[in-house]
């Protein structure tokens, strides 16, 4: 009997672990790689990932490992769940082993130095690989707890999309397909910025009207920026756009929301990130997004306002007051506008 070909999941964080568990529950053999041998050993011994996904029992079909080469050698389908700041350095040394494989990025971030999305970095490292992006309203703890969830696999490669759907689709996890890889990935990266602002608003006791305004204007702002870069605006009306934005801006389980909430409680940015204990991609994305928006002359007042709060000494209340003074323009459109 032929042994089942394993699927590799790169990353020992909360989402990588939830994804590995889901794959294993669907009958897949999973090699989950993490840089820290001690973490891999602890997960093998305890059957849990107490640092990033406490209280969730791991399926025995998961094989934690710190040997990246061995994990890649056996797998054809590879899910990449690494922080944006670490992805290039982690994978560049094993570029030859990535050639021809199906590489699916789950990281919702932007590389600060280059403003490249993770799938673009994967293409640079492994030009012959088949690239996809997995994104949507997918809080790791809820995926692990089998809450009803849907996601999007985006790629121009239809065979890759089908392979991912077959591997992940199950009783509580539904996988839709999209050909707009750029739009799906950009939506996942951009929404993290607005989740920080929503968390701050919640901590400061702002009303539901205010929260709703922030989310809907964030969607308009994200779409405006994405269209400027060539994305399909309709993508932002789906799971990877408004769906991901809503859950990230509304749930205390969201890492970026948690950072924003801590800031609203009076913690410094360093203290808020330290309390989280994990990477909050929105902080890094905010810095490069503001600069890129100015370079492209895209009107993004919420991004500029949050940057003023985090890095220029303004308060959220001051920024919102300035935004409310601005001249209102159109509500819903898919072309650049000059109004908040």
Swiss-Prot record:
Disulphide connectivity of cysteines: none
Pathway(s) per entry: Membrane lipid metabolism; glycerophospholipid metabolism
Location relative to the cell: Cytoplasm
Positions that bind sn-glycerol 3-phosphate: 108, 136, 191, 244, 254-256
GO cellular component: cytosol
Active site: 191 (proton acceptor)
Keywords: Cytoplasm, Lipid biosynthesis, Lipid metabolism, NAD, NADP, Nucleotide-binding, Oxidoreductase, Phospholipid biosynthesis, Phospholipid metabolism
Superkingdom field: Bacteria
Ligand binding (NADPH): 14-15, 35, 108, 140, 255, 279, 281
Top EC class for this record: oxidoreductase
GO molecular function, one term: glycerol-3-phosphate dehydrogenase [NAD(P)+] activity
Catalytic activity of the protein: sn-glycerol 3-phosphate + NAD(+) = dihydroxyacetone phosphate + NADH + H(+); sn-glycerol 3-phosphate + NADP(+) = dihydroxyacetone phosphate + NADPH + H(+)
EC number: 1.1.1.94
The keyword NAD belongs to this UniProt entry's keyword annotation: yes
Family of this protein: Belongs to the NAD-dependent glycerol-3-phosphate dehydrogenase family.
Cross-referenced HAMAP family: NAD_Glyc3P_dehydrog
Annotated protein name in UniProt: Glycerol-3-phosphate dehydrogenase [NAD(P)+]
Record organism: Ectopseudomonas mendocina (strain ymp) (Pseudomonas mendocina)
